[in-house]
């Protein structure tokens, strides 16, 4: 009887250590997956902008489709609660919500990516040199799972902008 009680106590102690560690690892893994998806979206946007001219949206601008695999809830993974894409805030922005971005003000050709996974903190990454914006009049907010985006290089008031929207 003492052996059974000892075994149960040992299992409870091990579970008390393993479960939080697994949750923490899941949050870290999901944050890394979202960061990788953001980097891929930025790379695809830059490639589109570098190889083409911006045209008005009604003149068949250059386009590219991109499929992102964003984390969903599961064992040892935290689901993406929200990923938003748009212009940076008007205040000085930084990486992961910091007050500054290496002491410089973000330029007008910048994009802000903001995300949070379940159990994690909100992250903000501002990428300078590329304007990725939701389709005019829309918002671009993504959640976990497979998402296919269409990127179009459009000219808006003479400025090159990557217009992003969900396909379909």
What is each of the regions a protein language model found here?
Residues 50-74:
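Short, glycine/small-hydrophobic-rich surface segments
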Residues 1-50:
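Hydrophobic alpha-helical segments
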Residues 18, 58, 83-87:
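General N-terminal targeting signals
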Residues 11-14, 23, 27, 55-59, ...:
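Generic structural signal for short, flexible, solvent-exposed coil/loop and linker residues
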């Amino acid at each position: 009887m003492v052996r059974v009680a000892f075994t149960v106590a040992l299992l409870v102690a091990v579970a008390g250590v393993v479960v939080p560690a697994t949750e923490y690892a899941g949050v870290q893994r999901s944050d890394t997956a979202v960061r990788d998806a953001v980097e891929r979206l930025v790379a695809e946007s830059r490639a589109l902008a570098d190889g083409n001219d911006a045209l008005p949206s009604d003149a068949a601008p250059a386009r590219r489709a991109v499929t992102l695999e964003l984390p969903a809830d599961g064992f040892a993974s935290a689901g993406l609660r929200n990923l938003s894409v748009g212009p940076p805030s008007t205040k000085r922005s930084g990486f992961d919500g910091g007050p500054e971005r290496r002491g410089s003000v973000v330029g007008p050709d910048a994009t802000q990516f903001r995300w949070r996974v379940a159990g994690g903190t909100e992250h903000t990454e501002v990428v300078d040199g590329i304007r990725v914006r939701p389709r005019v009049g829309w918002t671009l907010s993504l959640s976990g799972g497979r998402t296919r985006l269409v990127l179009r290089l459009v000219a808006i008031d003479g400025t090159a902008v990557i217009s992003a929207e969900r396909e379909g």
